């Protein structure tokens, strides 16, 4: 049934007739015979091929236990030449570089890499997928997509809510692990990657890995000058949060990618909870003309978007006497393209897994490369304790210390003052 739409109850009934629930102890390999019997029964009843996907929407502690039980019960492989076994795993993919490597090694001992699907729902969003199409199918953009024409790039994901009922998980994760290591890093890779030789999963994922490996590592001095962590006032009073917690609910960071395309171009990440607006954005700031004739006249406006969209802004002369310049937008909104239903991010990603298309799923080497960049920051924060943890009021734009990143004149108007 489409959200907000009428639907055929008969179709829903037909679908639900083929949905089954099975209760068993998923930590005990001896119990998995129940799952095997149910699979074999349903395959025979409906004449189904031996094609099975295991989806682990479970606590992270189960990411090693369940695959091990599948191995011990023989459910990790198929004897059918036309069959397959695939496993989908939700984030977090480890909590550090070491734990990510351990998890990857464990999974690859049980499944082949091409059978492992590490899901990030951000990559299932239509606008995110359209980044690649926008870049590589339009001759107007790709020649400009480099350090010669781009001044800086901002990628942000902000929320108005706090941790709500996720205090136990969030206090052990924080904004860096929860948002930046996966969602924002993946978004950045689509913005920064080189064109793949062909539009197929492995060439695309090869280019993503190259981007992650090209990020300039931080020195300890860099971490203090280029990374800001914050915590909203009242976080320590949240349910299941330690009263002396140093977990960050806000991160702003500046970094560079050391390759030809992005030499000298600063990238910025912003993410946080209890901020003024809920928004996910990628903002490309193009360089100004060498000689500014209309200084101060091309002012920016609100860039609030309630729908998925792509917007290109440029200055034009207003009608009438004089040369009053106004910033105007050329917008593309998905809801104006078609009245047909836009699939949810998970719908797209689950269908891809069924079809064996891993383009929008994280590969193990990309995962480890992203952790290699993030891990030193987390270790530095652990050593510092509460030092350089800045507090901000709920509903504000985050800690004032964010200005040390030097982006205060470039940041998006709808995110920060």
What does each model-found stretch correspond to?
Residues 1-89, 93-417:
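Secretory/organelle targeting and membrane-embedding segments
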């Amino acid at each position: 049934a489409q959200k907000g739409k009428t639907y055929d109850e008969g179709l829903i009934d037909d679908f639900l007739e083929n949905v089954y629930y099975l209760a068993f102890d998923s930590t005990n390999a001896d119990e998995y015979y129940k799952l095997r019997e149910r699979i074999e029964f349903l395959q025979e009843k409906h004449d189904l091929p031996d094609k099975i996907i295991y989806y682990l929407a479970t606590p992270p502690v189960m990411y090693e236990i369940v695959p091990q039980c599948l191995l011990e019960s023989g459910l990790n492989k198929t004897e059918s030449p036309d069959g397959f076994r695939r496993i989908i795993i939700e984030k977090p993919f480890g909590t550090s570089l070491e734990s990510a490597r351990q998890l990857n090694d464990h999974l690859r001992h049980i499944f082949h890499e091409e059978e492992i699907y590490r899901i990030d729902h951000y990559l299932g969003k239509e606008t995110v997928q359209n980044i690649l199409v926008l870049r590589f199918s339009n001759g107007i953009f790709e020649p400009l997509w480099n350090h010669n024409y781009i001044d800086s790039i901002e990628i942000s994901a902000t929320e108005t809510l706090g941790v709500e009922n996720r205090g136990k998980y969030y206090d052990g994760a924080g904004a860096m692990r929860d948002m930046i290591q996966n969602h924002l890093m993946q978004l950045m890779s689509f913005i920064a990657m080189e064109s793949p030789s062909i539009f197929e999963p492995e060439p695309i994922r090869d280019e993503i890995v190259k981007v992650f490996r090209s990020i300039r590592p931080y020195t300890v001095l860099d971490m203090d000058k280029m990374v800001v962590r914050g915590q909203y006032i009242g976080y320590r009073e949240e349910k299941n949060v330690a009263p002396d917690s140093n977990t960050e609910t806000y991160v702003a960071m500046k970094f560079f990618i050391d390759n030809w395309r992005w030499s000298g171009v600063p990238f910025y990440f912003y993410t946080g909870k209890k901020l003024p607006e809920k928004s996910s954005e990628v903002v490309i700031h193009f360089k100004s003309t060498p000689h500014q004739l209309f200084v101060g006249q091309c002012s920016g406006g609100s860039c609030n978007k309630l729908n998925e969209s792509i917007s290109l802004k440029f200055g034009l002369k207003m009608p009438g006497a004089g040369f009053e310049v106004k910033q105007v937008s050329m917008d593309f909104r998905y809801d104006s393209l078609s009245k047909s239903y836009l699939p949810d991010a998970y719908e797209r990603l689950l269908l891809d897994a069924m079809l064996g298309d891993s383009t929008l799923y994280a590969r193990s080497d990309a995962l480890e490369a992203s952790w290699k960049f993030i891990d030193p920051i987390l270790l530095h924060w652990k050593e510092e304790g509460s030092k350089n943890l800045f507090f901000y009021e709920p509903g504000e734009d985050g800690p004032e210390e964010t200005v040390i990143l030097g982006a205060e004149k470039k940041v998006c108007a709808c995110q920060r003052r």
